[in-house]
């Protein structure tokens, strides 16, 4: 009887700890680990200022304001994965090219789509045509790996954990009956599979994937403080960001949480 009682007490204690962390918005099931090395090619777009890399198909807007800066890349269709690749982080190193800077690597965040160009052969200009895996990097990121005049370089790459400062950020768009959320600064695997929103007077409401890193809910939520449930696309882990936005939230504003993946 003694061992059974001890086991029950431990499970009860663990359940209480789980609930406390989930309510605080700080619970994380584990750490995302680096993936295997693979091979691809990389090019660059824009100039040294990164002006042409702002915005993009993930919806992050001004990449300096959203925290990504110039360490970014547009992904080929295969890697972009209908927007579920947004926010993922990749370690990239130049491989087997005379233009490589020896021993150099850099980490970039996926912020854009490199669309296919079916007017050009996949091996002669149509670098982002499926099923190719390709990175069209911001020029400053590319220049960490190789001389820019190389144009295109063979690379080795792998998924790595996204190291983020602070919690996830939720940019609000929409109106009183349609809520559109862009999620930024996501740690861990960096990506999102699904989301739900909870008003202070509602149960959890599932949100649908709109485009890029945005999710939407068709519901009247104005006048309620809002919390979010976020599930990672890669790991399936779920965390809760409680009371992210106050009852007087408005579109065009970005609200910060304390919750994040690792």
From Swiss-Prot:
Is-annotated flag, keyword Signal? yes
Q: How does it sit in the membrane?
A: Peripheral membrane protein
In this chain the Expansin-like EG45 domain maps to: 55-167
Q: What residue stretch is flagged as signal peptide?
A: 1-30
Question: Which keywords does UniProt give here?
Answer: Cell wall, Cell wall biogenesis/degradation, Disulfide bond, Membrane, Secreted, Signal
Is Disulfide bond set as a keyword in this record? yes
Any single GO BP term: root hair elongation
Q: Which residues cross the membrane?
A: none
Q: Which CDD domains match?
A: DPBB_EXPA_N
Q: Which Pfam families match?
A: DPBB_1, Expansin_C
**Name of the protein:** Expansin-A7
């Amino acid at each position: 009887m003694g061992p059974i009682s001890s086991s029950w007490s431990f499970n009860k204690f663990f359940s209480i700890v789980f609930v406390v962390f989930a309510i605080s918005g700080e619970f994380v099931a584990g750490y995302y680990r680096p993936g295997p090395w693979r091979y691809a090619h990389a090019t660059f777009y824009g100039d040294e200022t990164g002006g042409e890399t702002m915005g993009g198909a993930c919806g992050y807007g001004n990449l300096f304001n959203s925290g990504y800066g110039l360490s970014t890349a547009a992904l080929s269709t295969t890697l972009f994965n209908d927007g579920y690749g947004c926010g993922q982080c990749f370690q990239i190193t130049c491989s087997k090219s005379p233009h490589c800077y020896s021993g150099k690597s850099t980490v970039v965040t996926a912020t854009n789509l490199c669309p296919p160009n079916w007017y050009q052969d996949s091996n002669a200009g149509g670098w982002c045509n499926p099923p190719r895996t390709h990175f069209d990097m911001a020029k400053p990121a590319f220049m960490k790996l190789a001389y820019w005049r190389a144009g295109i370089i063979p690379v080795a790459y792998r998924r790595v954990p996204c190291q983020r400062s602070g919690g996830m950020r939720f940019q609000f768009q929409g109106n009183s009956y349609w809520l559109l959320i862009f999620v930024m600064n996501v740690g861990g695997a960096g990506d999102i599979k699904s989301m739900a929103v909870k008003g202070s007077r509602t149960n959890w409401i599932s949100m649908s994937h709109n485009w890029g890193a945005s999710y939407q809910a068709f519901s009247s939520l104005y006048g309620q403080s809002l919390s979010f449930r976020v599930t990672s696309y890669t790991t399936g882990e779920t965390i809760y960001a409680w009371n992210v936005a106050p009852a007087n939230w408005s579109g065009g504003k970005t609200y910060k949480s304390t919750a994040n993946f690792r």
